[in-house]
């Protein structure tokens, strides 16, 4: 009897570990651009950050047109949530993600509609309502309770602090060096042109 119980426990633990490993395999870095690009930009962002939304509205479209679509730059979006609403949005953005950045752009374009609420629960409800209106198909409960995704998001933040001393958003890293100029397209373009 004890052997049977032990065998069942081992099977359950092994099955859960296998599921966890499978979940880890589907977590993909959100990025755009060629993997062979000479320049890699890493952006540390909080989905509730107004300056991050401004970057996506006013800088990113030109960056994409002039550098990313031409194969010169690859951009990777890293999570650096500054509050619980951003943390939950990061988990949702990473859940069932195929590596494309569409959901990130959707969240920034409607940031003022969902990134509000007096409680974390209210902000999460606003997020769910906003994405439902946008026809984004996500299992909210499953995504928000997924420990692997939670760890993935938190590890982005930890790595940002340890490796690049990130303390604000957005923080732009270009080929492993922090971009320390005012974040506008003119400055970014000038910097990138020197690297090409």
Task: Label each region the model flagged.
Residues 81-168, 173-186, 190-196:
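Cysteine-centric redox/oxidoreductase cores and disulfide-bonded domains
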Residues 2-83, 87, 149-163, 194-196:
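Extracytoplasmic thiol/disulfide redox context detector
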């Amino acid at each position: 009897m004890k052997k049977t119980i032990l065998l069942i426990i081992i099977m359950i633990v092994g099955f859960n570990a296998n599921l966890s490993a499978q979940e880890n395999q589907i977590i993909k870095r959100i990025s755009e651009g060629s993997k062979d690009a000479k320049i890699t930009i890493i952006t540390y962002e909080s989905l509730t950050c107004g300056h991050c939304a401004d970057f996506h509205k006013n800088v990113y479209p030109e960056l994409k047109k002039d550098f990313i679509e031409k194969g010169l730059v690859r951009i990777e979006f890293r999570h650096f949530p500054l509050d619980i609403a951003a943390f939950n949005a990061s988990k949702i953005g990473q859940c069932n993600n195929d590596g494309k950045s569409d959901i990130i752009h959707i969240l920034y374009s409607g940031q003022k509609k969902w990134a509000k609420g007096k409680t974390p629960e209210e902000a999460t409800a606003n997020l769910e309502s906003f994405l439902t209106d946008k026809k984004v198909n996500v299992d909210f409960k499953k995504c928000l309770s997924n420990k692997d995704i939670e760890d993935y998001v938190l590890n982005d933040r930890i790595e940002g602090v340890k490796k690049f001393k990130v303390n604000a958003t957005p923080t732009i890293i270009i080929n492993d060096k922090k971009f320390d100029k005012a974040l506008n397209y003119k400055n970014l373009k000038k910097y990138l042109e020197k690297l090409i």
